[in-house]
Amino acid sequence: MGSKLYQILGTAIICTMGINMGVVFTWPAFTISLFQSQNTTLNRPMTDMEISFFSSMSSIGALISTPTAGFLLDKLGRKYSSIFNSTGVALVWIILTLSRRVEWVLIAVLLSGIASSIFLVSSVYISEICQDSIRGTMTATNMVSYGLGMLLSYLLGGYLAYEMMLYVGLVLSVAGVVLLFLLKESPMHLLSKGLEQEAMQSIAYYRQLKIDSKEILDEINNMKRALNPDLDGDASPEEEKLKPDMKPAEKLSFWQFVKKSRSSRRAFVINLVVMTAAVFQGLIVVQIYAEPLFSEAIPTASPSFCSVMLAVAMAIAGIIAAFLTDIAGRRPLMIYASLGTGISCLVLGTQLQLHWGPTWITAVFMYIYPMMYTCGAGTVPFVLVAEIFLPEVKSIFSMILIELLWVCNFIILFIFNPLLKAVGWGPVFYIFAALSFLTAIYSFIFVPETKGLDVEAIQGLFAKKRKPKVNA
Protein backbone atom coordinates (compact mmCIF):
# COMPACT_ATOMS: atom_id res chain seq x y z
CA MET A 1 0.00 0.00 0.00
CA GLY A 2 2.26 2.74 -1.25
CA SER A 3 5.72 3.51 0.03
CA LYS A 4 6.59 3.27 3.72
CA LEU A 5 9.63 5.55 3.43
CA TYR A 6 7.91 8.82 4.40
CA GLN A 7 6.10 7.09 7.26
CA ILE A 8 9.45 5.88 8.59
CA LEU A 9 11.09 9.29 8.08
CA GLY A 10 8.13 10.99 9.75
CA THR A 11 8.40 8.60 12.69
CA ALA A 12 12.14 9.31 12.94
CA ILE A 13 11.49 13.06 13.15
CA ILE A 14 8.75 12.59 15.77
CA CYS A 15 11.13 10.36 17.74
CA THR A 16 13.55 13.27 18.16
CA MET A 17 11.11 14.31 20.90
CA GLY A 18 11.70 11.03 22.72
CA ILE A 19 15.48 11.37 22.34
CA ASN A 20 15.44 14.89 23.76
CA MET A 21 13.15 13.79 26.59
CA GLY A 22 15.50 10.91 27.42
CA VAL A 23 18.46 13.31 27.54
CA VAL A 24 16.78 15.83 29.82
CA PHE A 25 15.16 13.22 32.11
CA THR A 26 18.43 11.34 32.63
CA TRP A 27 20.48 14.51 33.20
CA PRO A 28 19.66 14.66 36.97
CA ALA A 29 20.98 11.12 37.51
CA PHE A 30 24.62 12.12 36.99
CA THR A 31 24.41 15.63 38.47
CA ILE A 32 22.98 14.79 41.92
CA SER A 33 26.41 14.14 43.46
CA LEU A 34 27.84 17.27 41.83
CA PHE A 35 25.01 19.48 43.08
CA GLN A 36 25.40 18.18 46.65
CA SER A 37 29.17 18.63 46.77
CA GLN A 38 31.10 21.68 47.94
CA ASN A 39 32.54 21.94 44.41
CA THR A 40 29.08 22.34 42.89
CA THR A 41 28.64 24.33 39.69
CA LEU A 42 25.60 26.02 41.26
CA ASN A 43 25.57 29.08 43.51
CA ARG A 44 25.51 26.74 46.56
CA PRO A 45 25.23 23.02 47.36
CA MET A 46 21.71 21.58 47.33
CA THR A 47 20.21 20.45 50.65
CA ASP A 48 18.80 16.93 51.13
CA MET A 49 15.26 18.30 50.75
CA GLU A 50 16.21 20.08 47.52
CA ILE A 51 17.78 16.88 46.19
CA SER A 52 14.50 15.06 46.90
CA PHE A 53 12.64 17.72 44.95
CA PHE A 54 15.31 17.60 42.22
CA SER A 55 14.68 13.88 41.64
CA SER A 56 10.87 14.08 41.76
CA MET A 57 9.95 17.51 40.34
CA SER A 58 9.71 16.11 36.81
CA SER A 59 6.91 13.76 37.94
CA ILE A 60 5.10 16.68 39.58
CA GLY A 61 5.43 18.68 36.36
CA ALA A 62 4.02 15.78 34.37
CA LEU A 63 1.03 15.57 36.71
CA ILE A 64 0.36 19.25 36.02
CA SER A 65 0.68 19.12 32.24
CA THR A 66 -0.79 15.77 31.22
CA PRO A 67 -4.45 16.78 31.85
CA THR A 68 -4.02 19.51 29.22
CA ALA A 69 -2.38 17.20 26.67
CA GLY A 70 -5.65 15.70 25.43
CA PHE A 71 -7.11 19.19 25.00
CA LEU A 72 -4.04 20.38 23.06
CA LEU A 73 -4.10 17.29 20.83
CA ASP A 74 -7.64 18.11 19.77
CA LYS A 75 -7.30 21.88 19.56
CA LEU A 76 -3.76 22.35 18.18
CA GLY A 77 -3.52 19.03 16.37
CA ARG A 78 -0.76 16.42 16.59
CA LYS A 79 1.88 18.45 14.74
CA TYR A 80 1.59 21.70 16.67
CA SER A 81 1.17 19.90 20.02
CA SER A 82 4.51 18.24 19.24
CA ILE A 83 6.12 21.59 18.43
CA PHE A 84 4.65 23.16 21.58
CA ASN A 85 6.03 20.44 23.88
CA SER A 86 9.40 20.31 22.13
CA THR A 87 9.76 24.06 22.60
CA GLY A 88 9.24 23.43 26.33
CA VAL A 89 12.24 21.07 26.35
CA ALA A 90 14.35 23.72 24.61
CA LEU A 91 13.27 26.21 27.29
CA VAL A 92 14.56 23.83 29.98
CA TRP A 93 18.06 23.92 28.48
CA ILE A 94 17.89 27.71 28.04
CA ILE A 95 17.14 28.16 31.76
CA LEU A 96 19.92 25.76 32.78
CA THR A 97 22.38 27.50 30.46
CA LEU A 98 21.58 31.01 31.72
CA SER A 99 21.30 30.39 35.47
CA ARG A 100 23.34 28.67 38.20
CA ARG A 101 20.86 29.31 41.00
CA VAL A 102 19.41 26.25 42.75
CA GLU A 103 15.88 27.65 42.51
CA TRP A 104 16.07 28.04 38.73
CA VAL A 105 17.48 24.52 38.33
CA LEU A 106 14.47 23.14 40.24
CA ILE A 107 12.13 25.21 38.05
CA ALA A 108 13.84 23.80 34.94
CA VAL A 109 13.35 20.22 36.17
CA LEU A 110 9.69 21.00 36.88
CA LEU A 111 9.36 22.38 33.34
CA SER A 112 10.90 19.20 31.91
CA GLY A 113 8.07 17.28 33.54
CA ILE A 114 5.52 19.70 32.12
CA ALA A 115 6.95 19.05 28.64
CA SER A 116 6.80 15.28 29.17
CA SER A 117 3.35 14.97 27.58
CA ILE A 118 5.60 14.44 24.55
CA PHE A 119 5.19 10.72 25.28
CA LEU A 120 1.44 10.92 24.74
CA VAL A 121 1.57 13.29 21.78
CA SER A 122 4.25 11.38 19.87
CA SER A 123 2.58 7.98 20.31
CA VAL A 124 -0.74 9.28 18.99
CA TYR A 125 0.95 11.16 16.12
CA ILE A 126 2.97 8.14 14.97
CA SER A 127 0.02 5.74 15.18
CA GLU A 128 -2.07 8.02 12.96
CA ILE A 129 0.44 8.57 10.15
CA CYS A 130 1.49 4.90 9.79
CA GLN A 131 -0.41 2.12 8.05
CA ASP A 132 -1.58 -0.91 10.04
CA SER A 133 1.22 -3.25 8.91
CA ILE A 134 3.98 -1.14 10.51
CA ARG A 135 2.02 0.80 13.15
CA GLY A 136 3.15 -1.32 16.10
CA THR A 137 6.83 -1.22 15.19
CA MET A 138 6.79 2.51 14.51
CA THR A 139 4.91 3.30 17.74
CA ALA A 140 7.31 1.13 19.74
CA THR A 141 10.19 3.04 18.15
CA ASN A 142 8.98 6.01 20.16
CA MET A 143 10.07 4.25 23.37
CA VAL A 144 13.32 3.17 21.70
CA SER A 145 14.06 6.83 21.11
CA TYR A 146 13.69 7.53 24.83
CA GLY A 147 16.20 4.77 25.59
CA LEU A 148 18.60 6.20 23.03
CA GLY A 149 18.19 9.60 24.67
CA MET A 150 19.05 8.09 28.05
CA LEU A 151 22.15 6.47 26.59
CA LEU A 152 23.20 9.69 24.89
CA SER A 153 22.72 11.59 28.15
CA TYR A 154 24.87 9.15 30.13
CA LEU A 155 27.61 9.25 27.50
CA LEU A 156 27.62 13.03 27.17
CA GLY A 157 27.40 13.51 30.93
CA GLY A 158 30.36 11.23 31.46
CA TYR A 159 32.67 12.89 28.93
CA LEU A 160 31.60 16.53 28.65
CA ALA A 161 32.05 19.40 31.07
CA TYR A 162 28.87 20.60 32.78
CA GLU A 163 28.50 23.74 30.62
CA MET A 164 29.20 21.89 27.37
CA MET A 165 26.53 19.30 28.22
CA LEU A 166 24.00 22.12 28.57
CA TYR A 167 24.92 23.58 25.17
CA VAL A 168 24.63 20.18 23.48
CA GLY A 169 21.21 19.62 25.07
CA LEU A 170 20.07 23.02 23.84
CA VAL A 171 21.26 22.40 20.26
CA LEU A 172 19.57 18.98 20.13
CA SER A 173 16.25 20.33 21.40
CA VAL A 174 16.20 23.31 19.00
CA ALA A 175 17.06 21.01 16.07
CA GLY A 176 14.14 18.77 17.06
CA VAL A 177 11.71 21.71 17.00
CA VAL A 178 12.90 22.79 13.54
CA LEU A 179 12.53 19.27 12.08
CA LEU A 180 8.93 18.97 13.30
CA PHE A 181 7.90 21.85 11.04
CA LEU A 182 8.69 19.61 8.03
CA LEU A 183 5.88 17.16 8.86
CA LYS A 184 2.24 17.14 7.77
CA GLU A 185 -0.64 16.95 10.23
CA SER A 186 -2.21 13.58 11.09
CA PRO A 187 -4.93 12.67 8.54
CA MET A 188 -7.24 11.42 11.30
CA HIS A 189 -7.08 14.77 13.08
CA LEU A 190 -7.72 16.66 9.83
CA LEU A 191 -10.72 14.47 8.99
CA SER A 192 -12.14 14.90 12.51
CA LYS A 193 -12.13 18.66 11.84
CA GLY A 194 -13.99 18.20 8.55
CA LEU A 195 -10.90 18.83 6.40
CA GLU A 196 -11.31 15.83 4.09
CA GLN A 197 -9.22 17.19 1.21
CA GLU A 198 -6.33 18.03 3.54
CA ALA A 199 -6.63 14.58 5.14
CA MET A 200 -6.35 12.95 1.70
CA GLN A 201 -3.29 15.09 0.93
CA SER A 202 -1.71 13.98 4.22
CA ILE A 203 -2.31 10.29 3.45
CA ALA A 204 -0.97 10.79 -0.08
CA TYR A 205 2.16 12.40 1.35
CA TYR A 206 2.91 9.70 3.91
CA ARG A 207 2.01 6.79 1.56
CA GLN A 208 3.56 8.44 -1.53
CA LEU A 209 0.40 7.77 -3.55
CA LYS A 210 -1.68 9.87 -5.93
CA ILE A 211 -4.44 11.71 -4.10
CA ASP A 212 -7.19 10.13 -6.25
CA SER A 213 -5.92 6.55 -5.84
CA LYS A 214 -8.24 3.77 -4.63
CA GLU A 215 -6.03 3.10 -1.60
CA ILE A 216 -6.47 6.64 -0.31
CA LEU A 217 -10.24 6.59 -0.87
CA ASP A 218 -10.47 3.27 1.01
CA GLU A 219 -8.43 4.62 3.91
CA ILE A 220 -10.52 7.79 4.12
CA ASN A 221 -13.67 5.65 4.24
CA ASN A 222 -12.16 3.52 7.02
CA MET A 223 -11.39 6.68 8.98
CA LYS A 224 -14.95 7.93 8.46
CA ARG A 225 -16.30 4.66 9.87
CA ALA A 226 -13.98 5.02 12.87
CA LEU A 227 -15.27 8.57 13.40
CA ASN A 228 -18.90 7.40 13.08
CA PRO A 229 -19.01 4.05 14.93
CA ASP A 230 -22.21 2.07 15.47
CA LEU A 231 -22.51 2.13 19.26
CA ASP A 232 -26.00 0.68 19.50
CA GLY A 233 -25.43 -2.64 17.85
CA ASP A 234 -21.73 -3.21 18.52
CA ALA A 235 -21.49 -4.21 14.87
CA SER A 236 -18.34 -5.85 13.62
CA PRO A 237 -16.17 -4.05 11.05
CA GLU A 238 -17.36 -6.54 8.42
CA GLU A 239 -21.00 -5.76 9.18
CA GLU A 240 -20.27 -2.03 9.04
CA LYS A 241 -18.77 -2.38 5.56
CA LEU A 242 -21.88 -4.22 4.30
CA LYS A 243 -24.14 -1.29 5.20
CA PRO A 244 -25.25 0.47 2.01
CA ASP A 245 -25.35 3.91 3.60
CA MET A 246 -23.12 5.37 6.23
CA LYS A 247 -25.22 7.97 7.95
CA PRO A 248 -23.43 10.46 10.17
CA ALA A 249 -23.63 9.36 13.78
CA GLU A 250 -25.40 11.48 16.36
CA LYS A 251 -22.89 13.90 17.88
CA LEU A 252 -22.34 12.77 21.46
CA SER A 253 -20.45 14.32 24.32
CA PHE A 254 -17.42 12.45 25.62
CA TRP A 255 -19.35 10.98 28.57
CA GLN A 256 -22.35 10.04 26.43
CA PHE A 257 -20.02 8.30 24.00
CA VAL A 258 -18.27 6.37 26.79
CA LYS A 259 -21.61 5.37 28.29
CA LYS A 260 -22.83 3.97 24.96
CA SER A 261 -19.56 2.35 23.83
CA ARG A 262 -18.94 -0.86 25.76
CA SER A 263 -15.81 -1.56 23.72
CA SER A 264 -14.27 1.82 24.65
CA ARG A 265 -14.93 1.27 28.36
CA ARG A 266 -13.47 -2.23 28.29
CA ALA A 267 -10.41 -1.13 26.31
CA PHE A 268 -9.79 1.66 28.81
CA VAL A 269 -10.07 -0.57 31.90
CA ILE A 270 -7.79 -3.26 30.46
CA ASN A 271 -5.16 -0.71 29.42
CA LEU A 272 -5.43 1.04 32.79
CA VAL A 273 -4.62 -2.18 34.64
CA VAL A 274 -1.76 -3.05 32.28
CA MET A 275 -0.26 0.46 32.51
CA THR A 276 -0.45 0.52 36.33
CA ALA A 277 1.03 -2.96 36.66
CA ALA A 278 3.83 -2.02 34.25
CA VAL A 279 4.95 0.91 36.41
CA PHE A 280 5.04 -1.21 39.56
CA GLN A 281 7.34 -3.73 37.91
CA GLY A 282 9.84 -1.19 39.20
CA LEU A 283 12.26 -0.15 36.48
CA ILE A 284 11.79 3.57 37.20
CA VAL A 285 13.38 2.95 40.62
CA VAL A 286 16.39 1.21 39.09
CA GLN A 287 16.84 4.08 36.62
CA ILE A 288 16.77 6.79 39.30
CA TYR A 289 18.83 4.86 41.86
CA ALA A 290 21.13 3.15 39.35
CA GLU A 291 24.46 4.24 40.85
CA PRO A 292 23.77 3.33 44.52
CA LEU A 293 22.16 0.04 43.43
CA PHE A 294 25.15 -0.91 41.29
CA SER A 295 27.49 0.09 44.15
CA GLU A 296 25.78 -2.47 46.40
CA ALA A 297 25.07 -5.14 43.80
CA ILE A 298 28.41 -5.06 41.95
CA PRO A 299 30.91 -3.35 44.30
CA THR A 300 33.92 -4.22 42.13
CA ALA A 301 32.62 -2.31 39.07
CA SER A 302 32.36 1.42 38.40
CA PRO A 303 28.76 2.55 39.12
CA SER A 304 28.98 5.17 36.35
CA PHE A 305 30.09 2.58 33.79
CA CYS A 306 27.34 0.19 34.93
CA SER A 307 24.75 2.96 34.54
CA VAL A 308 25.89 3.61 30.97
CA MET A 309 25.69 -0.11 30.20
CA LEU A 310 22.17 -0.13 31.67
CA ALA A 311 21.15 2.49 29.12
CA VAL A 312 22.85 0.45 26.36
CA ALA A 313 20.94 -2.68 27.41
CA MET A 314 17.63 -0.81 27.41
CA ALA A 315 18.30 0.72 24.00
CA ILE A 316 19.09 -2.71 22.53
CA ALA A 317 15.98 -4.20 24.15
CA GLY A 318 13.88 -1.34 22.79
CA ILE A 319 15.06 -2.03 19.25
CA ILE A 320 14.27 -5.74 19.69
CA ALA A 321 10.83 -4.91 21.11
CA ALA A 322 10.05 -2.55 18.22
CA PHE A 323 10.96 -5.31 15.75
CA LEU A 324 8.93 -7.99 17.56
CA THR A 325 5.82 -5.87 18.11
CA ASP A 326 4.57 -6.48 14.56
CA ILE A 327 6.19 -9.93 14.27
CA ALA A 328 5.31 -11.75 17.50
CA GLY A 329 2.42 -9.46 18.49
CA ARG A 330 1.63 -7.30 21.50
CA ARG A 331 0.03 -9.94 23.71
CA PRO A 332 2.84 -12.56 23.63
CA LEU A 333 5.44 -9.84 24.22
CA MET A 334 3.61 -8.61 27.31
CA ILE A 335 3.08 -12.10 28.72
CA TYR A 336 6.53 -13.61 28.19
CA ALA A 337 8.50 -10.43 28.91
CA SER A 338 6.59 -9.97 32.20
CA LEU A 339 7.43 -13.56 33.14
CA GLY A 340 11.09 -12.85 32.32
CA THR A 341 10.98 -9.66 34.39
CA GLY A 342 9.49 -11.56 37.34
CA ILE A 343 12.13 -14.30 37.18
CA SER A 344 14.92 -11.70 36.96
CA CYS A 345 13.57 -9.81 39.98
CA LEU A 346 13.26 -13.04 41.95
CA VAL A 347 16.88 -13.95 41.21
CA LEU A 348 18.08 -10.43 42.06
CA GLY A 349 16.07 -10.33 45.29
CA THR A 350 17.43 -13.62 46.60
CA GLN A 351 20.97 -12.79 45.49
CA LEU A 352 20.98 -9.34 47.12
CA GLN A 353 19.47 -10.70 50.33
CA LEU A 354 21.16 -14.11 50.64
CA HIS A 355 24.32 -13.66 48.48
CA TRP A 356 24.01 -17.26 47.31
CA GLY A 357 26.06 -16.86 44.11
CA PRO A 358 29.04 -15.06 42.61
CA THR A 359 28.88 -11.36 41.73
CA TRP A 360 28.62 -12.02 38.00
CA ILE A 361 25.14 -13.52 38.50
CA THR A 362 23.98 -10.22 39.96
CA ALA A 363 25.58 -8.34 37.06
CA VAL A 364 23.93 -10.55 34.43
CA PHE A 365 20.43 -10.26 35.90
CA MET A 366 20.83 -6.53 36.54
CA TYR A 367 20.84 -6.23 32.74
CA ILE A 368 18.38 -9.03 31.90
CA TYR A 369 15.79 -7.35 34.15
CA PRO A 370 15.62 -3.98 32.32
CA MET A 371 15.83 -5.70 28.93
CA MET A 372 12.85 -7.92 29.75
CA TYR A 373 10.97 -4.95 31.15
CA THR A 374 11.63 -2.85 28.05
CA CYS A 375 10.46 -5.63 25.72
CA GLY A 376 7.15 -5.93 27.56
CA ALA A 377 5.94 -3.43 30.16
CA GLY A 378 8.14 -0.64 28.82
CA THR A 379 6.76 -0.87 25.27
CA VAL A 380 3.45 -2.71 24.86
CA PRO A 381 1.20 -0.46 27.04
CA PHE A 382 2.28 2.59 25.02
CA VAL A 383 1.55 0.82 21.73
CA LEU A 384 -1.90 -0.12 23.04
CA VAL A 385 -2.62 3.44 24.21
CA ALA A 386 -1.90 4.70 20.70
CA GLU A 387 -4.00 2.19 18.76
CA ILE A 388 -7.00 0.80 20.66
CA PHE A 389 -9.23 3.85 21.14
CA LEU A 390 -11.78 5.37 18.79
CA PRO A 391 -11.02 8.97 17.71
CA GLU A 392 -13.86 10.40 19.87
CA VAL A 393 -12.20 9.25 23.11
CA LYS A 394 -8.59 8.78 22.07
CA SER A 395 -7.16 12.08 23.29
CA ILE A 396 -8.93 12.08 26.67
CA PHE A 397 -8.47 8.37 27.44
CA SER A 398 -4.80 8.54 26.43
CA MET A 399 -4.35 11.63 28.60
CA ILE A 400 -5.92 9.89 31.61
CA LEU A 401 -3.70 6.84 31.19
CA ILE A 402 -0.51 8.87 30.86
CA GLU A 403 -1.58 10.96 33.87
CA LEU A 404 -2.02 7.71 35.79
CA LEU A 405 1.46 6.69 34.68
CA TRP A 406 2.95 9.81 36.28
CA VAL A 407 0.88 9.39 39.45
CA CYS A 408 2.19 5.83 39.79
CA ASN A 409 5.76 7.00 39.08
CA PHE A 410 5.44 9.63 41.80
CA ILE A 411 3.98 7.12 44.29
CA ILE A 412 6.64 4.48 43.71
CA LEU A 413 9.49 7.02 43.94
CA PHE A 414 7.95 8.68 47.00
CA ILE A 415 7.56 5.45 48.99
CA PHE A 416 10.69 3.76 47.71
CA ASN A 417 13.35 5.34 49.94
CA PRO A 418 11.58 4.59 53.27
CA LEU A 419 10.66 1.13 51.97
CA LEU A 420 14.28 0.44 51.04
CA LYS A 421 15.51 1.54 54.48
CA ALA A 422 12.87 -0.63 56.15
CA VAL A 423 13.31 -3.90 54.24
CA GLY A 424 16.40 -3.63 51.96
CA TRP A 425 16.87 -4.32 48.25
CA GLY A 426 15.98 -8.03 48.42
CA PRO A 427 12.32 -7.75 49.50
CA VAL A 428 11.86 -4.75 47.19
CA PHE A 429 12.71 -6.98 44.23
CA TYR A 430 10.34 -9.67 45.57
CA ILE A 431 7.52 -7.12 45.32
CA PHE A 432 8.53 -6.28 41.75
CA ALA A 433 8.63 -10.00 40.92
CA ALA A 434 5.15 -10.66 42.30
CA LEU A 435 3.67 -7.76 40.33
CA SER A 436 5.43 -8.93 37.16
CA PHE A 437 3.93 -12.42 37.45
CA LEU A 438 0.47 -10.94 38.10
CA THR A 439 0.87 -8.76 35.00
CA ALA A 440 1.63 -11.84 32.88
CA ILE A 441 -1.45 -13.65 34.21
CA TYR A 442 -3.71 -10.65 33.63
CA SER A 443 -2.38 -10.15 30.10
CA PHE A 444 -2.95 -13.82 29.28
CA ILE A 445 -6.59 -13.62 30.38
CA PHE A 446 -7.69 -10.16 29.28
CA VAL A 447 -5.39 -8.55 26.69
CA PRO A 448 -6.41 -9.28 23.06
CA GLU A 449 -3.99 -9.36 20.13
CA THR A 450 -4.16 -6.17 18.05
CA LYS A 451 -1.31 -6.78 15.59
CA GLY A 452 -2.07 -5.55 12.07
CA LEU A 453 -5.66 -4.52 12.87
CA ASP A 454 -7.29 -1.16 12.27
CA VAL A 455 -9.15 0.58 15.09
CA GLU A 456 -12.54 -0.80 13.93
CA ALA A 457 -11.34 -4.39 14.18
CA ILE A 458 -9.62 -3.71 17.51
CA GLN A 459 -12.82 -2.25 18.95
CA GLY A 460 -14.61 -5.39 17.76
CA LEU A 461 -12.29 -7.48 19.96
CA PHE A 462 -13.13 -5.40 23.02
CA ALA A 463 -16.87 -5.41 22.22
CA LYS A 464 -17.10 -9.20 22.27
CA LYS A 465 -19.14 -10.59 25.12
CA ARG A 466 -18.11 -13.79 26.84
CA LYS A 467 -20.16 -16.75 25.72
CA PRO A 468 -22.18 -18.32 28.56
CA LYS A 469 -21.12 -21.78 29.61
CA VAL A 470 -23.47 -24.58 28.52
CA ASN A 471 -24.00 -27.30 31.08
CA ALA A 472 -23.84 -30.81 29.70
Regions found by a protein language model. Name each.
Residues 206-216, 232:
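Short intracellular "coupling" helices and adjacent cytoplasmic loop segments at the cytosolic face
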Residues 1-204, 232-472:
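Alpha-helical transmembrane bundle of multi-pass membrane proteins
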Residues 203-206, 223:
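AAA+ P-loop ATPase catalytic core
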Residues 193-196, 213, 217:
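Generic detection of long, well-ordered alpha-helical segments
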Residues 210, 227-230, 465:
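Short, flexible helical or helix-coil boundary motifs
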Residues 214-229:
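TPR/TPR-like alpha-solenoid helical repeat scaffolds
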